[in-house]
Amino acid sequence: MSDAPVTLSQVAREAGVSLATASRAINGSATRSVREDLRERVLETARRLDYSPDPSAQAMARGRTSALGLVVHDIADPYFSTIAAGVARAAERAGLIVTLASTEHSPERELAFVELARRQRSRAIILAGGRLAPDDGGAGAGGAGAGSAGGAGGSGATGGSEGADPEMSALDIETGSTADRPGSGAPTSDALEAALKAFRDAGGGVALIGQPVDDLPVVKVANADGAADLARALHGLGYRRFAVLAGPTRHRTAADRTDGFTGALSELGSAPPPEDVLTCAFTRDGGYSAMTTLIERSGTGTPSGNPGHLPELVFAVNDVMAVGAMAAVRDAGLSVPDDVAVAGFDDIHTLRDVSPGLTTVRIPLAEVGALATDLALGRSNQAGAQVRGEVVLRESTPERNR
């Protein structure tokens, strides 16, 4: 028996179809399709003969390369790296290679990468980032009455509504992580949306992780529902006085989580006062700063301080901020959970060894990445998907005796 590899001609002959039909069935085609029964016959024959398609031929036939582009703000952020791992595994199963762009919060680089992927005829592109919420004066993150944390030392909280956070990008589709820093002349959200639609209209696949943009496929995280579930669980443990580290003003993810948490507490009669909903950066340092503001304002740890002015529990809208808040408590000579309890959101796997263990809402981020990949490649019949979180109670929020 010959050791020569099986050729496409052999597959076509064995399946009883023309070489062109066999090529279209196996490699795909940008212009012509194959009847489903013929395609199945060819694919079954290829499997039986152990035929290995030529990736270059597939790319030429489809008019697409085997690259899948993934755009994130910061690959060093564990939120994005976990999503990227899920994308990479799903892409590997599809025989694709992931091309990663870490934009460092630059909307110019974000737009440039989408246009580069279109020029290079990548198979698909996935955007994972954050998105601006409408500036409607609502009570979400940065809504009316929200406080504002100062610098690393915590310059205090001020009431009142703020404008758009200067660090936010023109279009960042759901982060769970850091804010953007647009430069002068940053592209608008319309420009990025137009680039994504042009990529799709040229035959590429597109998926977003976060909030929907027009009719583009999206994997949404049920942020408000998860935060509401957490609020109810913490209230059930006996907590009544809460504060929220709400993230950047007008950041969609932060707003959804803040609104879900405070809304559930309002229904339970334990809504935090507006001055205890603090806007801050969506980072470890942002959490540290906002927590320091709460501690300094309460006077806890000082001769004239009143420990009763410190909230019983502080909810940070992501885990990284929660870790910063816990560090601020420690640096102030206080203890989590003895002096104040802390909870986060996301259940970042690299933070699960934090002591005390952090109560949070677990989001299956790798699954989110895999779902987005399936949407981008057209492997799902759905126009989108939604992922719901699970409350995980740990040592940072023990049951409170009242």
Residue ranges and their predicted role:
Residues M1-G63, G145:
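N-terminal helix-turn-helix DNA-binding module of bacterial transcription factors
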Residues S2-D3, P55, A67-R232, G236:
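Alpha-helical recognition/docking segments in bacterial nutrient-uptake
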Residues E14, L19-R24, A61-D74, A233, ...:
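Short beta-strand segments enriched in small/hydrophobic residues
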Residues P55, H73-T82, A101-R109, R131-L132, ...:
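Hinge/beta->alpha junction and helix N-cap segments in small-molecule ligand-binding domains
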Residues E110-R121, Y288-G308:
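Short, well-structured alpha-helical segments in soluble
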Residues S122-G130, G205, A243-L245, V277, ...:
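Periplasmic-binding protein-like
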Residues R240-R241, P272-D276, S335-A341:
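Short acidic capping loops at alpha-helix termini that bridge into adjacent secondary structure
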Residues I295-R402:
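Flexible loop/turn connectors
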